[in-house]
Swiss-Prot record:
Record motif LPXTG sorting signal, residues: 952-956
Protein name listed in UniProt: Clumping factor A
Upper lineage: Bacteria, Bacillati, Bacillota, Bacilli, Bacillales
PROSITE patterns according to UniProt: GRAM_POS_ANCHORING
One Gene Ontology cellular component: extracellular region
Family according to the record: Belongs to the serine-aspartate repeat-containing protein (SDr) family.
């Protein structure tokens, strides 16, 4: 397989714009005039076939100057030659190579700069960003890429030159290709390593060697001689200095920086006075041309100042007699500058500083050189680093095997690029080749600057031949016919001055790889001559040339080849990713949503999560949802979370939900919560849920919650719960309550309770409640609970509750919870709820309670209760109570009570009882006295009265009336005995 890479070098034209306004009094005519001085932008239209016709300074050539940069290349599409907003510049006519001299008509020599870019695309049509192919006209190539491979704004700069040294603009490009002699079906692509990110970036890439030596000749180096005038650099005023470039400069892709200067000339300036522009040693003003010049500063068709470059690379301008007759002169200068390969040899950051006198500007940029191309064990890169159009010579530097791989039977050939009108002359007479061996690949500079004295000259140890026309061959004979170190090949060649073609060179490296496959890799360097072109950019492009017919054979000049590349790729990827995240979020959301969802999900999940979140959210949501979901979930989660949340929510929701879930949960929860909530809730929910859930959760949470909610809820719930709880309760409560209660309750309860309670409670309660409740409750509860609870609560509540609840719940719950909680709660709730509850609970409770209660209550109770209770109670109670009660009750009770009671009652009863009791009771029951061991209950202890509108029962026979009378007398006797005992106790006190 063969791969080809192209490199392109660009030639930059220099322009200097100078604006000067002069106001003077013309005594002879009595007129005032002022003029703005601008830098001249001289266009060169000279071709290699020079004519001897002399040109005069006519007005037409001057008037065309302001548009020089846009029109000097009429056939091209480049926009790089714009004037960049500089002041208008008068154009001097282009000079041909003649003996005529004129100090005011300077010509322009274009400044080439190396531009390189690498690509691995093979034989593809070029896009505007990759405009390079063997059949592309050089002028079009340059202009298509002038604005796309450089990071800088386009600019134009004129340069000074004597008429006899006028040259054409030059653009240099480079291309590489690689090839191999594998079977046709096994063509291999060339992995190109051209991304700047693949290179190590050093912090400072400037060569510290001093003094700096320029690799070009200086035109009119007059600054080193004593100047006749005065240096007025520090007398210039309104000095402005800027450096324009991107953050990264790619020297091998025609990258450059733009230096801008503006200033005002003092009125005291005279002919011969000078000023200096300092250019940093990291930059040069010539690019790849051998001669560097600066253009004069023009004021219309007059020269304001002439510039030269001194031996240190700085620019010295000398004013002409123009300033003797003018005042208020201003000037603006723009110059492109290129990275100096001798002083910046590696990729890295460089700080550039330039200025006029004490007025300077600095900018740090990343200099990024392109790496060589590599194909299997073959690696090569070439660059044209110098062009001398005066002597028609060029210099090409080629790195052979810069990777230091093992290559068997290595050979290098150089020839013209096929299908191009290359003007290079390659033969023994016009081509001189030097070969240097590099012992350590790290000694190669990335800028392709070569100091021959640093390497061993092995030219006499290699075989150099010219086997074909316009072709040279270099063989690297060694003892074992293989090389493992890099070599540098320097080609000093000539250009045919009579040719109208472009400089286009191909270097091809041959050799066997480790599998003894004969391979080749090519690198193309191309120079395009563009008359009057401001800039030219080049990119690298790989192509696949024809392979040698036999292993070891060196191809002469390859013919045209067409290929249709295609690619078939398939990828199979397996990725394993893990994430650990912590989030801190603050959100304020308002949503209005209505959703109707019907979902059925069956999920089995096990999650272990450790999360810490700090969230502050305020949400205002109005949602109405109708959801019908059936979910069967089996989840086991172990979570340890600490959350601190402050939320204020105002929610108005109406939801109609029908869900059936099967849940079996075992949770072990250790939570410490500090909650401060102010909730105002208004919710209307109609929920019918049948849940069967099986979950095993171990939760340790520490939450600090401050919530403000406004809730209005209307709930209709139908739940079926079966609860089996075991609780052991030790409570210490201090309660002070002041309650004003008005209740109207109609209760029908049938309870079968077997309780043995040992309660020790100390309660001090202070509550102020205003409650208006209307409840219709039908409950059948069978409770078996064994609870062990240790709680310490301090509660201060102020509640105003108006509830109308109708509840029908059937719940079957099996929970095993181990909870240790400490809560500090301050809540202010305003709740209006309408609930319809139907509950059927089966409770078996075994409670051991030790209660020490100190209660002070001020109770004003007006109750009208109609209670029918059937109670079977077995209680053993030790009670000390003092009560002040005003009750009016209508009670129909049938109680079967078995009570073993030891009662020590100290009662100080000062009661003002106004009881209005209208009791019509009819009983067909077998009532057991209160001391009966079974089936005894006290209906007056239940606040579950129910107004009955049924007709009064039949009073029965006379015998039943007599029995009632007897029991009435016995009750009266018992009452007298009771009041007597109380009176005796009072007298004792």
């Amino acid at each position: 397989m063969n791969m080809k890479k192209k490199e392109k070098h660009a030639i930059r034209k220099k322009s200097i714009g100078v604006a000067s306004v002069l106001v003077g009094t013309l005594i002879g005519f009595g007129l005032l005039s002022s003029k703005e001085a601008d830098a001249s932008e001289n266009s060169v239209t000279q071709s290699d076939s020079a004519s001897n016709e002399s040109k005069s300074n006519d007005s037409s050539s001057v008037s065309a100057a302001p548009k020089t940069d846009d029109t000097n290349v009429s056939d091209t599409k480049t926009s790089s030659n714009t004037n960049n907003g500089e002041t208008s510049v008068a154009q001097n006519p282009a000079q041909q190579e003649t003996t005529q001299s004129s100090s005011t008509n300077a010509t322009t020599e274009e400044t080439p700069v190396t531009g390189e870019a690498t690509t691995t695309t093979t034989n593809q049509a070029n896009t505007p960003a990759t405009t390079q192919s063997s059949n592309t006209n050089a002028e079009e190539l340059v202009n298509q890429t002038s604005n796309e491979t450089t990071s800088n704004d386009t600019n134009t700069v004129s340069s000074v030159n004597s008429p006899q040294n006028s040259t054409n603009a030059e653009n240099v490009s480079t291309t590489q290709d690689t090839s191999t002699e594998a079977t046709p079906s096994n063509n291999e692509s060339a992995p190109q390593n051209t991304d700047a990110s693949n290179k190590d970036v050093v912090s400072q890439a400037v060569n510290p060697s001093t003094p700096r030596m320029r690799a070009f000749s200086l035109a009119a180096v007059a600054a080193d001689a004593p100047a006749a005038g005065t240096d007025i650099t520090n007398q210039l005023t309104d000095v402005k200095v800027t450096i324009d470039s991107g953050t990264t400069v790619y020297p091998h892709q025609a990258g450059y920086v733009k230096l801008n200067y503006g200033f005002s000339v003092p009125n005291s300036a005279v002919k011969g006075d000078t000023f200096k522009i300092t250019v940093p040693k990291e930059l040069n003003l010539n690019g790849v041309t051998s001669t560097a010049k600066v253009p004069p500063i023009m004021a219309g068709d007059q020269v304001l100042a002439n510039g030269v470059i001194d031996s240190d690379g700085n620019v010295i301008y000398t004013f002409t007699d123009y300033v003797d007759n003018k005042e208020n002169v201003t000037a603006n200068i723009t110059m492109p500058a290129y990275i100096d390969p001798e002083n910046v040899t590696k990729t890295g950051n460089v700080t550039l500083t330039t200025g006029i006198g004490t007025n300077t500007a600095s900018k740090t940029v990343l200099i990024d050189y392109e790496k060589y191309g590599q194909f299997h064990n073959l690696s090569i890169k070439g660059t044209i680093d110098q062009i001398d159009k005066t002597n028609n010579t060029y210099r090409q530097t080629i790195y052979v095997n810069p990777s230091g791989d093992n290559v068997v039977l290595p050979a290098l050939t150089g020839n013209l690029i096929p299908n191009t009108k290359s003007n290079a002359l390659i033969d023994a007479k016009n081509t001189d080749i030097k070969v240097y061996r590099v012992d350590n690949a790290n000694d190669l500079s990335e800028s392709y600057y070569v100091n021959p004295s640093d390497f061993e000259d092995v030219t006499n140890q290699v075989r150099i031949s010219f086997p074909n026309a316009n072709q040279y061959k270099v063989e690297f004979p060694t003892d074992d016919d293989q090389i493992t170190t890099p070599y540098i090949v320097v080609v000093n060649g000539h250009i045919d001055p009579a040719s109208t073609g472009d400089l286009a060179l191909r270097s091809t490296f041959y050799g066997y790889d480790s599998n003894f496959i004969w391979r080749s890799m090519s690198w193309d360097n191309e120079v395009a001559f563009n008359n009057g072109s401001g800039s030219g950019d080049g990119i690298d492009k790989p192509v696949v040339p024809e392979q040698p017919d036999e292993p070891g054979e060196i191809e002469p000049i390859p013919e045209d080849s067409d290929s249709d590349p295609g690619s078939d790729s398939g990828s199979d990827s397996n990725s394993d990713s893990g994430s650990d995240s912590g989030s801190d979020s603050t959100s304020d959301s308002g949503s209005d949503s209505a959703s109707d969802s019907d979902s059925a999900s069956d999920s089995d999940s096990a999650s272990d999560s450790d999360s810490a979140s700090d969230s502050d959210s305020a949400s205002d949501s109005d949602s109405a949802s109708d959801s019908d979901s059936a979910s069967d979930s089996d989840s086991a989660s172990d979570s340890d979370s600490a959350s601190d949340s402050d939320s204020a929510s105002d929610s108005d929701s109406a939801s109609d939900s029908d869900s059936a879930s099967d849940s079996d949960s075992a949770s072990d929860s250790d939570s410490d919560s500090d909650s401060d909530s102010d909730s105002d809730s208004d919710s209307d929910s109609d929920s019918d849920s049948d849940s069967d859930s099986d979950s095993d959760s171990d939760s340790d949470s520490d939450s600090d919650s401050d919530s403000d909610s406004d809730s209005d809820s209307d709930s209709d719930s139908d739940s079926d719960s079966d609860s089996d709880s075991d609780s052991d309760s030790d409570s210490d409560s201090d309660s002070d309550s002041d309650s004003d209660s008005d209740s109207d309750s109609d209760s029908d309860s049938d309870s079968d309770s077997d309780s043995d309670s040992d309660s020790d409670s100390d309660s001090d309660s202070d509550s102020d409640s205003d409650s208006d409740s209307d409840s219709d409750s039908d409950s059948d509860s069978d409770s078996d609970s064994d609870s062990d609870s240790d709680s310490d609560s301090d509660s201060d509540s102020d509640s105003d509750s108006d509830s109308d609840s109708d509840s029908d719940s059937d719940s079957d719950s099996d929970s095993d919870s181990d909870s240790d909680s400490a809560s500090d709660s301050d809540s202010d709730s305003d709740s209006e709820s309408d609930s319809d509850s139907d509950s059927d609970s089966d409770s078996d409770s075994d409670s051991d309670s030790d209660s020490d209660s100190d209660s002070e209550s001020d109770s004003d109770s007006d109750s009208d209760s109609d209670s029918e209770s059937d109670s079977d109670s077995d209680s053993d109670s030790d009670s000390d109570s003092a009560s002040d009660s005003d009750s009016g009750s209508d009670s129909d009770s049938s109680s079967d009570s078995d009570s073993d009671s030891t009662s020590d009652t100290g009662s100080d009863n000062d009661s003002d009882s106004d009881s209005n009791s209208d009791s019509e009771s009819g009983s067909n029951n077998n009532v057991v006295p209160p001391n009966s061991p079974k089936n005894g209950t006290n209906a007056s202890n239940k606040n579950e009265a129910k107004d009955s509108k049924e007709p009064l029962p039949d009073t029965g026979s006379e015998d039943e009336a007599n029995t009632s009378l007897i029991w009435g007398l016995l009750a009266s006797l018992g009452s007298l005995l009771l009041f007597r005992r109380k009176k005796e106790n009072k007298d004792k006190k």
